[in-house]
């Protein structure tokens, strides 16, 4: 189930670190939730920390999980927000950059960046190999 699938996070984190680097002190926690309209959601808590919720009510196929987890975590929303805070807020003192608007043009850009990050992180790893890796994790 979902608990075993979270075993993919260290791999996603390593790939993102190799491609984009990781800001100091970043981290996240993954929670399983119910009764939500989405399959996954990133709640950025600040301090380079995120809480990622995965909805267990919706069926998520193995292939879907190879998109949802990195989209919300590494190199997706979590890493984007952590770097945003590290550079703009902490580095340049732009406190206004600590406000994350919902249903704004910035939100649209964030979705696109998360999708592009996933595509970049998965380049070089054939989808068949990734699904094979996932099947091994799920079989445990």
Regions found by a protein language model. Give the residues of each.
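Contiguous, non-catalytic segments that form substrate-binding/exosite surfaces or channel walls
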Residues: 1-52, 59
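Hydrophobic (often cysteine-bearing) scaffold residues that line and stabilize catalytic clefts
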Residues: 5-8, 66, 106, 110
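Primarily interfacial, aromatic-capped hydrophobic alpha-helices that serve as membrane anchors
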Residues: 11, 34, 114, 120-121
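Short, solvent-exposed loop/turn segments at the edges of secondary structure
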Residues: 45-49, 63, 109-112
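Short alpha-helix carrying the canonical HExxH Zn2+-binding catalytic motif
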Residues: 62-79
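Post-HEXXH active-site segment of zinc metalloproteases
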Residues: 63, 79-106
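Long, well-ordered alpha-helical segments
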Residues: 75-87, 120-130
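Long, amphipathic alpha-helical stalk/connector segments used for oligomerization, subunit docking
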Residues: 111, 118-140
């Amino acid at each position: 189930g979902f608990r075993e699938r979270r075993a993919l996070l260290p791999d996603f984190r390593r790939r993102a670190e190799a491609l984009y680097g990781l800001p100091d002190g970043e981290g996240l926690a993954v929670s399983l939730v119910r009764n939500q309209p989405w399959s996954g959601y990133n709640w950025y808590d600040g301090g380079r920390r995120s809480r990622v919720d995965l909805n267990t009510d919706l069926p998520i196929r193995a292939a879907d999980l190879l998109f949802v987890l990195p989209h919300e975590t590494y190199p997706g929303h979590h890493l984007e927000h952590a770097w945003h805070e590290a550079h703009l807020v902490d580095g340049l003192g732009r406190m206004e950059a600590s406000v994350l608007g919902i249903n704004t043009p910035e939100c649209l850009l964030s979705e696109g960046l998360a999708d592009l990050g996933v595509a970049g992180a998965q380049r070089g790893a054939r989808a068949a190999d990734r699904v094979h890796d996932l099947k091994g994790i799920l079989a445990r």
